[in-house]
Amino acid sequence: MRPHAVHALIAVKRLDQAKSRLADRLRPEHRARLVLAMLADTMTATTSVPGIAAVTVVTPDAAVADLARSLGGHVHPEPAADSADSLNAALAAAAAGVRARHGGVDLLALQADLPALRPDELADVLATAPRGGRAIVTDHAGTGTAALLVRDGGELAPAFGPDSARRHIAAGAVDLPGEWPGLRRDVDTAADLERAVELGAGSSTRALLRDIGWSCRVHEPARRVC
């Protein structure tokens, strides 16, 4: 892999612990399928960007790992502990492994739940970000981090979790100002999912939502959705 190629890293929790804030709208098995569908759309968009050479998915979940490999991704096993600290440690370890194998490649840590992500958004991020140093794209709320890009050969040093944008900026990351609605729209709630659909969710997420009958407005009761 050539220096300054970008290697993307995507962390995914165990499926039985994912998307708990959608529990009032979706049964556990539907939430698990949604996580996989959104990951598929996120990976498909990411691997379509010419400047991104490879994707590694960091996960303790076998089903997630199988999907990642089927889409051409690499897998770094994350310890099963479910916390922001364990996720950040696993991302950092995966990033160090990438650098050990491929030298001074650029690193891009992405959220896994970006079903409306478009390749041109990521391409614009890579074109807009400073050639050296660190940069982030905040999420739609302005407090989380949708993407963390490291181009200075330094450690990834991820700080995902509550208020991660502030922590990444305090550590020297530039807050990129582009619009990029699909990149900024991670999905934690029913309202987030509806907005992602409005923006144009990818084919895997659309197919899953049709299959499980996600057709009601956000404020309507769960019994009419599932």
From Swiss-Prot:
GO biological processes: F420-0 metabolic process
Q: In which pathway does it act?
A: Cofactor biosynthesis; coenzyme F420 biosynthesis
Please state the Enzyme Commission number of this protein.
2.7.7.105
Q: Which UniProt keywords apply?
A: GTP-binding, Nucleotide-binding, Nucleotidyltransferase, Transferase
Q: List the Gene Ontology MF annotations in alphabetical order.
A: GTP binding; phospholactate guanylyltransferase activity
Which residues are noted in the entry as phosphoenolpyruvate-binding? Answer: T145, G161, S164
Listed under catalytic activity are: phosphoenolpyruvate + GTP + H(+) = enolpyruvoyl-2-diphospho-5'-guanosine + diphosphate
* The protein's enzyme class: transferase
Name the Gene3D superfamilies for this protein.
Answer: Spore Coat Polysaccharide Biosynthesis Protein SpsA, Chain A
- So what family is this one in? Belongs to the CofC family.
Functionally, this protein is described as follows: Guanylyltransferase that catalyzes the activation of phosphoenolpyruvate (PEP) as enolpyruvoyl-2-diphospho-5'-guanosine, via the condensation of PEP with GTP. It is involved in the biosynthesis of coenzyme F420, a hydride carrier cofactor.
Q: Which NCBIfam families match?
A: F420_cofC
Q: What is this protein called?
A: Phosphoenolpyruvate guanylyltransferase
Natural source organism: Nocardia farcinica (strain IFM 10152)
This chain is encoded by the gene named fbiD
